[in-house]
């Protein structure tokens, strides 16, 4: 039976490809998609969810727009990475359907209530919507199987020296998620920076030759440009968000450790840092499954295989 999931995202090139991967995978049942501000403004990320679902002919999936700003901070966006639209590069269709007349939290709560089995939440943007759900609906915690997030890092940040972008945008929300008592799976930069898509991988996707694989290749063409900066030392573009979906589909591609994770919300230099107790120094019980490595070729092969679904 397919695993029910709720996808909360802020498209974003890698979020868009995570949607493509999830909807090409019969092992997953995407119950709803909610949007958050992050990679672009809330209006643009919502529009990008609708555009992607229009492209994929999945306008049956309920969509709702989430929080317009973090819990306690002003919004930061990553338009320098994702462009003016949030999905610059390919020509995407205009949305042919409208979002639900409710908030992201209301749609999430409704989806959890109506599900006969616990639902996995996959969150590939800032954790604002998920934190609001957890705080406003404690009675639904038991309906959440796990929360799989793209965010954080054991080591170096990508937005500040200490912090990864998604966590930095709303560290208070991320701390609520990690300390919720619900199982958390963390795909941080330690693994996503190894999940790089090289130019030859993009050409492999393009050669599959269907409209969706072509769009994915064009998204990657644009996404690669930002990551060519020598400071990163990358061969390709790190495909952060699809690691969450890939872990659900093929956990054997990933190396994980069980550790306690906390989020720094006060630090002078370290706000938004995910503090991973790798050496068990705090005495805190592990609260997260932390991805630390990936079989890059296996990850690329999975993407290529699933893109054929759209023929």
Curated annotation (Swiss-Prot):
The active site is at 240. Hydrolyzes with equal efficiency cytidine or uridine to ribose and cytosine or uracil, respectively. PROSITE patterns: IUNH. GO terms for cellular component: cytosol. Keywords: Glycosidase, Hydrolase. SUPFAM superfamilies: Nucleoside hydrolase. It is an enzyme of class 3 (hydrolase). It holds the Pfam family IU_nuc_hydro. One of its GO terms (molecular function) is purine nucleosidase activity. Its EC number is 3.2.-.-. Belongs to the IUNH family. RihA subfamily. One of its GO terms (biological process) is purine nucleoside catabolic process. This is Pyrimidine-specific ribonucleoside hydrolase RihA.
